[in-house]
Amino acid sequence: MAQQTPLYEQHNLCGARMVDFHGWMMPLHYGSQIDEHHAVRNDAGMFDVSHMTIVDLRGARTREFLRYLLANDVAKLTQPGKALYTAMLNASGGVIDDLIVYFMTEDYFRLVVNSATREKDLAWINEHAEPYGVSVTVRDDLSLIAVQGPNAKAKAATLFTDAQRKATEGMKPFFGVQADDLFIATTGYTGEAGYEIAMPNEKAAGFWSQLVEAGVKPCGLGARDTLRLEAGMNLYGQEMDEGVSPLAANMGWTIAWQPEDRAFIGRDALEAQRENGTEQLVGLVMTEKGVLRGELPVRFTDDQGNAREGIITSGTFSPTLGYSIALARVPAGIGDTAIVQIRNREMPVKVTKPIFVRAGKPVTQ
């Protein structure tokens, strides 16, 4: 039986179409995925992301532990509340999960990990935390609501206390702050400004209904996927998994190679991959009729005249741009164009950087 978040009844009240998403009953949409998408790009929308797992790590050696566990380096986190996006790798350099880590105090860090990978993540973290004497606490007592869009912060702030407004004033992207009973972070999965707000489960339903009254549109998994794809953000299980290197998933920027003497899980494998070369993640744009979908083959001829083939990892119709976009993992050597096989048709596509929309504006040329 699929689990329900504390907002399940709110979703039904808002007219959601519910689906089983990795063992959780979650809203796919509330009537129109397209309208929800546009609300986030142009105004403010909100998502129930309580199915994600919040993990608190405590202990004197927590920073040392995370410097070993994660490919990015928490030594960069010197200001309380600062957050970091990173991969957690296996020994062969594959991605166990991508996650956000927050520096709270010197002996207290917070992780937010994906729902689909929850059990293996927790097993991996617990296994490696033990030698460091780090305690691992899963915060199932917290709900998480993402409020996203150009007007999201202003509308969310109408629910804040004076202390919460003061705590979030002038907050830069990728920070989190505990303000009374809310943990408010300037993070998201849409390419828009906004907050991800963690709160006690018993407060979530009331907070959600107040956001509705403040003019924030409830949004489901469908809009969440088209928004993150436009923003060029990876989805675990599609752009990367335990068999895919972060170097092949446009995540090279999240690997902290310096200092050279920092040993982290997967480092040796990554260094070999960097030396030998890997596939790469690119963007695809198709302005002709049709929709690019995951698993479709991408074919091109490299500069040596060799026929090469990759695969679309995620594809959709872009509501913001009005045509189809995709992310694809391809061998090195791809040029500016390629061919995608859609049923029995060979469709020409333009190859771009793996990002299509930034702050509501097209970036694809």
UniProtKB/Swiss-Prot annotation:
InterPro entries: GCS_T, GCS_T_bac, GCST_C, GCV_T_N, GcvT/YgfZ/DmdA, GcvT/YgfZ_C, TrmE/GcvT_dom1. One of its GO terms (biological process) is glycine decarboxylation via glycine cleavage system. Keywords: Aminotransferase, Transferase. This is Aminomethyltransferase. The glycine cleavage system catalyzes the degradation of glycine. Transmembrane segments: none annotated. PANTHER family: AMINOMETHYLTRANSFERASE (PTHR43757), AMINOMETHYLTRANSFERASE, MITOCHONDRIAL (PTHR43757:SF2). SUPFAM superfamilies: Aminomethyltransferase beta-barrel domain, Folate-binding domain. The glycine cleavage system is composed of four proteins: P, T, L and H. Pfam families: GCV_T, GCV_T_C. Belongs to the GcvT family. GO terms for cellular component: cytosol; glycine cleavage complex. The keyword Transferase applies. Its EC number is 2.1.2.10. It is an enzyme of class 2 (transferase). It comes from the Bacteria. GO terms for molecular function: aminomethyltransferase activity; transaminase activity. It catalyses: N(6)-[(R)-S(8)-aminomethyldihydrolipoyl]-L-lysyl-[protein] + (6S)-5,6,7,8-tetrahydrofolate = N(6)-[(R)-dihydrolipoyl]-L-lysyl-[protein] + (6R)-5,10-methylene-5,6,7,8-tetrahydrofolate + NH4(+).
